[in-house]
């Protein structure tokens, strides 16, 4: 089975990506393909000459000027740092579902800056046939969190009303910080449909996360999200951060490793 790891970076986070790739190779013991998705700011500039299995893949910026102007006029996430217009590169993460990736059977996507503490083999070997594996965002203590909280319902009530009429928003939802999916799920129109959703429902508070759930975690398109394995007898697999007094050494990988002395955001 052909597998690739996908990650993303703009110019600001290049050094974090380089560190993460080193950890994937040296600690994660993964020697397969790694695709780094980039945009305009790194086009024809970022190279990885020391590793011929690191593929730098440029994708063009998607025009969001009209949506961004509306969001600047009526911000939707002031308590969260306004990623809707301050972190617009996050929309580039949607390219993880581009037809380009059909050349692999399984794709393991992760945010730049992820910390790797153990070999990735156990995660890479998880069975994702006909599914997307990812971690529930409300784990473990916020089991009342449903998909509706990922979308603004105040500043743009008319958009929320349309969204609520089209999708079931009272479902659990997954983090888009990391996921593994079977590329047979990629239809000819998958990427275009996801982009259309992202423009129509631009009031997704954490940009890509809500949109990916609309497509892969709802009856209208696909209802194929499965909770990724949390742990086995030897280790925890992945979480956003350490939980319940656990130490980073008890995980394969973390997004934010607060107990790790070498971690910085």
Language model: regions and residue ranges:
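Glycosyltransferase catalytic domains, chiefly GT-A lineage
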Residues: 1-265
């Amino acid at each position: 089975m052909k597998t690739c790891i996908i990650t993303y970076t703009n110019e600001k986070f290049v050094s974090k990506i380089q560190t993460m790739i080193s950890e994937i190779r040296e600690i994660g013991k993964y020697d397969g393909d790694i695709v780094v998705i980039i945009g305009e700011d790194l086009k024809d500039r970022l190279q990885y000459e020391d590793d011929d299995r690191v593929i730098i893949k440029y994708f063009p910026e998607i025009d969001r000027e009209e949506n961004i102007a509306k969001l600047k006029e009526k911000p939707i996430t002031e308590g969260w740092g306004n990623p809707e217009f301050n972190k617009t590169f996050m929309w580039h993460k949607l390219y993880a579902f581009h037809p380009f990736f059909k050349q692999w059977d399984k794709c393991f996507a992760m945010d730049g800056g992820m910390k790797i503490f153990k070999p990735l083999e156990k995660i890479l070997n998880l069975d994702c046939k006909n599914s997307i594996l990812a971690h529930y965002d409300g784990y473990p203590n916020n089991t009342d969190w449903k998909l509706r909280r990922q979308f603004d319902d105040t500043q743009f009530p008319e958009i929320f009303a349309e969204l609520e009429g089209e999708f079931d928003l009272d479902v659990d939802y997954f983090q888009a910080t990391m996921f593994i999916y079977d590329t047979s799920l990629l239809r000819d129109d998958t990427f275009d449909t996801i982009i259309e959703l992202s423009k129509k429902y631009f009031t997704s508070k954490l940009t890509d996360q809500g949109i990916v759930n609309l497509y892969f975690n709802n009856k209208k398109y696909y209802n194929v999200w499965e909770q990724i394995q949390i742990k086995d007898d030897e280790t925890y697999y992945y979480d956003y951060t350490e939980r319940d007094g656990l130490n980073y050494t008890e995980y394969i990988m973390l997004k934010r490793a607060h107990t790790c002395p070498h971690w910085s955001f």
